[in-house]
């Protein structure tokens, strides 16, 4: 009998943990969304994965990496543009490659 109560107590603690952390609420919302789908998806598991993935807040590190990527892309575009301008400027002062070889 004592073993039964200990297991019951552990289950209750685990249930409270899931409730506090929002797991039960999130699972319930996703399952309700699946239930309310007019056309059920072929893969209920894929539906759950997709909706659970969207329900979790994004890792802050991912957002920082996105910002860093955007900055680097801007710098890259600026450097490419500057490179074009410098090549055009340089072409004004250097004879074309074919003339150099003839000399």
From Swiss-Prot:
Give compartment(s).
Answer: Cytoplasm; Nucleus
Q: Which UniProt keywords apply?
A: Cytoplasm, Nucleus, Transcription, Transcription regulation
Which species is listed as the source? Pongo abelii
* Any one GO CC term of the record: nucleus
| MF terms (GO), sorted A to Z | transcription coactivator activity
Q: Does the keyword Secreted apply?
A: no
Which InterPro entries does this entry report, sorted A to Z?
Answer: AMY1
| Family indicated by similarity | Belongs to the AMY1 family.
**What does the UniProt function comment say about this protein?**
May control the transcriptional activity of MYC. Stimulates the activation of E box-dependent transcription by MYC.
Q: Name one GO biological process term.
A: regulation of DNA-templated transcription
What's the subunit arrangement here?
Binds via its C-terminal region to the N-terminal region of MYC. Associates with AKAP1/S-AKAP84. Interacts with MYCBPAP. Interacts with CFAP91.
- What is the protein's name according to its record? c-Myc-binding protein
């Amino acid at each position: 009998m004592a073993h039964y109560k200990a297991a019951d107590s552990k289950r209750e603690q685990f249930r409270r943990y899931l409730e506090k952390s929002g797991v039960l609420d999130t699972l319930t919302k996703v399952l309700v969304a699946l239930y309310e789908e007019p056309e059920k998806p072929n893969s209920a598991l894929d539906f759950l994965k997709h909706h659970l993935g969207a329900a979790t807040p994004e890792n802050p590190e991912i957002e920082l990496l996105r910002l860093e990527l955007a900055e680097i892309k801007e710098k890259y575009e600026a450097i490419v543009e500057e490179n074009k301008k410098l090549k055009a400027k340089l072409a004004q002062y250097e004879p074309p490659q074919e003339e150099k070889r003839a000399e």
